[in-house]
Amino acid sequence: MGDPKFHHKKYSTPRHPWEKERIDEENKIVVKYGLKNKKEIWRSEALLSSIRSQARDLRARLRTNDVNAQKQLERMIKRLNRYKLLSENATLDDVLSLTVENILDRRLQTIVFRKNLAISVRQARQLITHGHISVAGRRVTVPGMLVEAKDEDTIAYEENSPVANELHPIRQALLAPAQRSAEMKEGQGEASEEGETDE
């Protein structure tokens, strides 16, 4: 089992390291989620494997009318719901249908990018590791942290970070596309009004 004070691997490497289809699929995931390396995929796969293993065990125990199995299933679904991986009314089949991308979608790095706090998913990682992002008022520097649903709305720039200033170049770059689209809409509106007056 090993000494608990030492770090242990939280993932296992692929059994066949040179499978082209798997490598291509992993490369797409690395680009999509801005991952540092494939270990981050394997770590998510290990977590998913653990969840599925528990679900399969519970399914077998439910068939034998195990008294505690239903309670454990409810606790599992409640825990997964806390991370917005499943709904409150989810079933065992929903647990078994979870994918690696469902796990990666709950990473802090992914959510920072989707909340439009970074220009790219890679930049989201940089902002987190450099201490520019806070969750529930606390600075977080771990891009791979799984975010609970209750904390998602509290993700913001760290108050003492220079990026928190709206005049920071990153903030201006984030505002630029929105401003351009707003100006285009205004221009289209003015053009249509002019057309109506000409008639």
Swiss-Prot record:
One of its GO terms (cellular component) is small ribosomal subunit. Keywords: Ribonucleoprotein, Ribosomal protein, RNA-binding, rRNA-binding. Pfam families: Ribosomal_S4, S4. This is Small ribosomal subunit protein uS4. Part of the 30S ribosomal subunit. Contacts protein S5. The interaction surface between S4 and S5 is involved in control of translational fidelity. One of its GO terms (biological process) is translation. The gene is rps4. One of its GO terms (molecular function) is rRNA binding.
